């Protein structure tokens, strides 16, 4: 294997000794040679045999591909008539729905920018995002409109028509239904949109600090679309995906509102996750792919006998898990209970447009604990966080990524951008990883989540894995607890299994027998559940706040 500069690259690991870069072993993505193309046009121009684009799992209401593209054109026509121009920011506050992609695709086709927000956010959190991103218009559903009532933004209601009660109290300018019924106009004001122009402004989860706006370009999204096509790329329109992941999140947005449309796939959308609704939808619509996060996969595993007896899941070919690597026990337990279903895994960040690494078949997933191999056209470095030295195979350091899906930067935040992306385009992920001799990435821990005990570094993930191996523990999280003498020590939050009377001393003794003295857990609190974000990652900062509030 050789890269473009003719440096010799090890075919097995993808590592190049001369520049200390790991290169992807996957086929590279092809980007359009025409630079004046937006992601909506790129997706809509692809040929496939798909018939139905989106189905609402609850109501059965659907959009065919012709209906989808007509709706996108109609909404874009109305937005243009309202004065929406290239570079304007549009806020979308909505749960998953078949109309979510219509709004996104219409906005981006004009060169305007979509910014999404979590429907569970408080009015204060949404107001903060509005102040930062400065949208000129908002789309939302009637049930959520009160959350942006104080913003004075003009609002389009995602409904068939506007109820008179809303019009009296808010600045409601239209309904999505009304806009979709508009005849598309070929004469609307058009702006030349380039691949480098901004398409989305998504706010990262902020698990390591204040939430920041991630600026992604049309090129980033087109590269994401091409990566998804390379993974699921049959263009026969025969795949059916269940969408349980939130569309306001980068993976939900890029995969379900964009990428999978290019292959003619049908996407069955759940407005919110409910396991019975999800399983019923798989059975009813003969779904072939189920993207999910590890907690849902664990629920499928724990209730396997009941689920197999009640639901026909014979159409299901693969589950796609993201958020955290799966253990050997989970993978083999799942394969044993669902022998016709493959497990695929993925790793990515909002800053990398949801792309970074993946396993693309069960054989790759059986490299237990891996996040996968580098995505197409992605390059990586493993960097010693203390010295800045780039490391080789099987050495642990911070994972840096570079490729066509890496964000442009953080919105109006040059300081955060320059501390995250260097002058050569390398994104510092904040994840401690190593890449093995076959090119598989293993995430060891979050760099910023390391506990410093008397100068020693302790990885919470290592202790969490040990805690989860205890027969009476169903979930656990480890955080740094401040200590005058040691600086910090490991504290565990533990969820007991039903009927367990596990004590703090028993938990501490259990870990003490398994780790070096500096890694020992020195405080335990028992809780009903561990707080996690929508992708299944532990909200460690919430637990740290809980622990330190009692000091």
Swiss-Prot record:
Residues 346-410 are annotated as: SBD2. Keywords: ATP-binding, Cytoplasm, Ligase, Nucleotide-binding. Mostly expressed at low levels in glandular trichomes (lupulin glands) after flowering, and, to a lower extent, in stems, leaves, cones and flowers. Its main location: cytoplasm. The keyword NADP does not apply. It is found in: Cytoplasm, Cytosol. The keyword Nucleotide-binding applies. This is Probable CoA ligase CCL5. It comes from Humulus lupulus. The gene is CCL5.
